[in-house]
Every structure is written in C-alpha cells, then in structure tokens.
Amino acid sequence: MWRTEDGGTSWSAVRGSPGGDDYQRIWIHPTDPNLILAVSDQGAVVSSNRGESWSNWYTQPTAAVYHVTTDNAFPYRVCSGQQDSGSICVASRSDDGEITFHDWHPANIQEYGIAAPDPRDPEVVFGSARRGVSRYDRRTGQTAQVGPDSAARGEKFGRNVRTMPLIWSPVNPNVLYYTSNVVWKSVDRAHTWTRISPDLARQTWTVPASAGRYASSVTPAPRGAITALSPSPKSGAVLWAGTDDGNIQVTTDGGATWKNVTPAAIKPWTRIFNIEAGHFDARTAYAAANTLRIDDMHPHFWRTHDDGRTWTEINHGIADNAVANSIREDPRVPGLLYAATDAQVWVSLDDGANWQSLRLNMPAISVRDIQVKDDSTCVCADLVAGTHGRGFWILDGLTPIRQLARSRGRAGTYVVTPQTAVRVRFGTNEPTPWPPELPAAQNPAAGAIIDYALAANAAGSVKLEIVDASGRLIRSYSSDDPVLDPDPALDPASYDRVCQKNPGAADCGLPLYWPAPQQRLATHAGLHRFRWDTRYQPIGDNPRTGEVEATGAVPHRSERTPVTPWAAPGRYTVRLTVEGKSYTQPLTLRLDPRVKTPPAGLRQLAALSREMYDLAAASHAAYLQARARVDSLSGAARAQVESLAPAAPARAPRALARPGQPAPATPPTLESASRAALAAAMAMQDADVAPTAAQVAACTRARAQVNAVLARWRRLEPPPRRSRRR
C-alpha cells in the first residue's frame, strides 16, 4: 500500500509484506482522513492514525482455501494452503475448550497448494503446488523439496497449474500420487518418482468464445493440466483423472493404459474440479465439472457406474446459480453423496437423483472442497468443508443423515444408532480461560451424541436413560427435569433478579456470556440431538447439579459440570421412553486414544471411582431417609438421628463435593461422609491415570467413614412395619 502527499509526484510504502498482501480495496473517511479501511485477500484492517498503525485480520474468519484434507492424528487436523496467508493445519478439537491459534501450525505449502499428510506419520505433511512437492516435518520445522523434478522444468516434468493433486492411495499407504499434465507415482514417500501416464489433457486447443478480446490469433499451444485425481478405494489398479481443459480419463491397470471417458456434453475449457472414485464399486465414479471459464454458471455433477462408458448428469434439486466444485461419496453408505458449489453444501440420499440443502448455519460462500472424515483413528463421522473466504467448517456427526439414507427417509419415533463416543474432557485450560475477545472456533461437543426422532408431539414427558452392560442405570434425563437456575442465555432478566436477591446463587457474579444454554429433552415432533456427558447421575435432588467451572470455561459454551465421576469405557444402551414405549440402541464409549496408561491402572481407576460414587450415593440416600424420619421422633431418638443427619443450612451447597474439598470435622455425619467419598472420587477424575498412593489412601479413609456412619444409621433405623395378620 502506497501513499502520496504531493499529488502523486512521490510515493512511500506504508503497509505490505515481502510476500505481498494483495490489497483489493481501500476506503478513507470523507471527513476524517485518519480513519482508513483496507481489505486484502486475508481480511480487513483498520487504521485510526492515517496508516501509522493498523488492526490485524486475524480477528476475522476469512481464510480462502482451495482444498481440504485431514490427517490421522487424534484429534485430527484439517490442512490446506490458503490465499496469501500461508498454509495451515488446525486441530478439529482443542484441549482448551475452544480452538484458538494455539491449535494450528503452518505446513509450508504454497498458498494454493494441496496438503497430503502422511497416513503413517501425521507430523509429516506433503504439499503440492506449481513448484512441485514439499515435505514438511513438524518436529523439526524443516521443509524439503521432493517433487518429481525439483530443479528443472520443461517437457520432462510437464505442465502444471496452481492446484496440483497430491493424494495417497487409499489401499496402500506407501503409494503417493502427484500430477502435472501427467500422473506421477512414488512408492517410497517421494524419494523417487515414476511417470505412469501420457499427457492426459486435450490435444486440441480451441479457445472458447468467452475468452473474448483476450483470444490470440496465434495457434494456441498445449496448456491443459490435471486438476483432479482419485485412486479407487476398491482397487489399487484403478485411477481417475480430470483436467482443467475438460478431460476425464481412467486407468484400470495401474497406469499402463488410459482411456478417455469424457462425457460428450462436457465442453473444452471445462475444469474438472474433482473426481470421487466409488467406495463400494471400482467401476463407479462421480465428477464435479466447473464451467465458470466458459460463462456457464450452472452446477454440473456427473455419475458413472460402468468405468465411464456412460455418464448421467445429477443436478436435480441443486440451486441453478452456482458452479460445481466438489462431490464426495459417503464411505459407509452407498448412494449417500455430498456436493459443494460456489454457494453451499448439498446432500443426496439416492445416488444423486435428488439433492437437498445441507447449508444449515454456514454462510453463503464458495465451498471449494469437502471431505468425509471417518476412520478408526478419529473415532468420528464428520463432513469437513474448505471455503474460499470463511475458512474451514465441520459438520459433526453424520449418523442421522446416514440412517435417513439407509432407510430412504425413515419416519416414526426412533433413536439413531449413536456413533462410538470418545471420553474426552471438554476443556483443561486452567485456571484462567481465554478472553472472549480472542478469535476462536467452537470445539465439538464432548460426550456421547444421541439423536432421536419423534413422529408427533409427545403427549407427556420424554425420558432418556443410559444403562450399562449389567443393566444398571447410569444416567437419566427427563423433559420434566427442573431447571437449575434461570438460564442467562435464554432469560437474562430473570437471572439478574435471582442474583440480586441471592448473590450466592450458582454462577452469580459472572458476566452473562459465560454459561451455556442448558440442555432440554425436546418433546415436539422432529429430529433432535442430545448429549450425554459420559458421567454418572448427579447425587442429590436436582439431576442437573453443577456450576460453571473456571477450568475449561468458554464464552457462551461453559457447561455446568456435574460433580460425579466419569463412566467407564465399555458398552451401554441408550433407552428413549415416549408415552410408555421404549426405543433402544447400543452405544460404545471409548477412552481417549492418546491415553497410554496400562490397563491395570485404568481398571483400578474405574473400580475406585465407582466404589466411591456408590458409597457417596448410599450415604446420601441414608441421609434423606433419616431426615424423613426426624419429624416423627422426639427426645433421645430424635437427637441421635439428628446427630447423623443434621438439617442442611438455609442455602445448601450447590454440590456435594469438589476435588480437594476437605470433609467437615468429626464427628462424621451421613452427609459429610457422602461428601468425603465423592471428594475422593472426584480427585481422581482429572486424568486417565492410575490413582496415586495419596488418592488410594483418601479412598480408604472415605470408605471407613461411610461404612461407620451407615452402621450407626442401621442401628438407629427402625425396622419396617409388618402388616398384622387377620
């Protein structure tokens, strides 16, 4: 950015970078020249002092990416080059409760390049672009140039454009493909390359009329390059290739021979943005043909089931106002397709015969690429989108869409089979959370996601229960559950009134933007989503006991954490009850894959946690029984019971115990013993590690305390009345 103060006689640079910021617009306030707004490929910046200093564009989610890929880390990272801001790999989940700059790293790929994380080592990211192939090692920060010809250019290397495909074989993790106008193959992680195709671009170079005055009378030279490549997940011998001048070619013998299978309706200069080889049939493929360069703004998606001999255009239902960019097949459900255009994302449940919008909460933006992330390492089923101007987006949990596709639009009341849940902690950033001014992206929900459908509005309450493999009830929710406190996210005025009357109420003193809206089981017709936090049932009258914790707090998403242990990894049953009828589905809960604690230590942790929880629950239940009997007693009997179960203070504690919270002084009561046992349990919940000697000792003390007060209660508790014989 340049400035002149003498009518253009001389100029001075006031803002820019060695790599070029690509400024597109500038605005100066008409009456206050101190105020300047500049916009570039990265975002907008503002100066209030005539350009002496500027705000930064990292406050805006304006990343313009060309492609999107994921690695095999946990949590998985989403990678791409981005326009004039370098490359990026960003975690799909953060341990800090929200995704911030701490969770991303550059990968030294050219801005328009394609990332190809090593499937066997997620710390290594290969990248493609016009200058070849790069290999970035996150551990060292070093980048090596490892393309087919990293020094020379010309016919030996071939022609290329900005976004050159670079992709690993889905059937052989040692095979890497790269393209120019020919296809290259490496079997040793880019140390050596072999050319496995001829020139796959068009051999006639007619310039379309849309070139207008830019057309030349000189006979055009060959210019096409490969812009789409898809190795088959069913056969290592099958590859599909598409070019930026409108060719689709396929090989079924590993590149020995290629066949041009371009649909007759695809015109020269059509850019094949991507091809998706079928996940269930090696003869199937889908293609996204982008016709922007020939002044055709309509979407064009294609499908073949016979090696490209015949093609069907599959656009019905897609808005006719944006070109095609990407198409993907769900790897779990045949015929379930996802498509991206220059405006939004679409979904088809019937192999492309019909499409419907899947935009949801995404902005209207050019979606350049989409990927279905579903494998054993991520323990997920997500749709990842890369946009040209709004960064990355992830649709978490494709299971409801998959069930609809399998049943072709299932009706009625049912529970969707949940995907495997991973027991992770939502946030571990202690003790001070990131301020709300820090740009951040949302974490996916922590816990088990449970989707259910109601055919009609429920006549009564709806109940959702989690049952373990032994049949024991672990957690229960009801649409009639009381609300803990007025919800500041939904009723701030009422929340303020409660806090004014009782400053000791839960979360009072916090700004209203911290707590998350409380979950409520929906009772109206439709498809609904609920989350089990993978903890045991809270102990006490209110099943939603809990407060916003400082650790892991996130603006607008801070959960009221139940003061109960984590449920152990294993098999569970989800049971939905509506109008007296129950619907069930199995649920598997897994440990965080990053945990390396030996099984014996994990078993000890689970056993002690459950034992302390059971002791706390038993002691609290006895306390409630004792309090129920107090009014019917008098004299010494009443005094003895009250010594075990004294009345709670006017303002009872919000929770029975917290990690590290000391038990009240002796003599112990039923409630203090319950608090001691729960405190011992909660002290072990911060990490999936074997209990320490101190924690085991605390459990031993709590066990003895609970057993002692329960024994005293049993001696005082009158036997149940027996009915008289008549």
Model-derived features with residue positions:
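Preference for long, solvent-exposed alpha-helical segments and helix-linker "stalks"
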Residues: P511, R544, D592, R603-A645
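Glycine-centered tight-turn motifs at strand-turn-strand junctions
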Residues: L473-P565
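Low-complexity, Pro/Ser/Thr- and charge-rich linker/hinge segments at domain boundaries
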Residues: T399-F426, T584-A618
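Contiguous beta-strand segments within globular domains
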Residues: T428-K463, V467, A525-R531, S609, ...
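Beta-propeller blade termini and top-face loops
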Residues: M1-L438, A445-A448, P482, P486-Q500
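Mature extracytoplasmic or organellar-lumen-exposed domains after removal of signal/transit peptides
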Residues: L587, H620-R726
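Short acidic/polar inter-strand loop motif in beta-rich domains
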Residues: P538-N542, T577-Q585
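Beta-strand-rich binding/interaction modules
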Residues: S134-R135, I450-D451, A458-S476, R571-R575
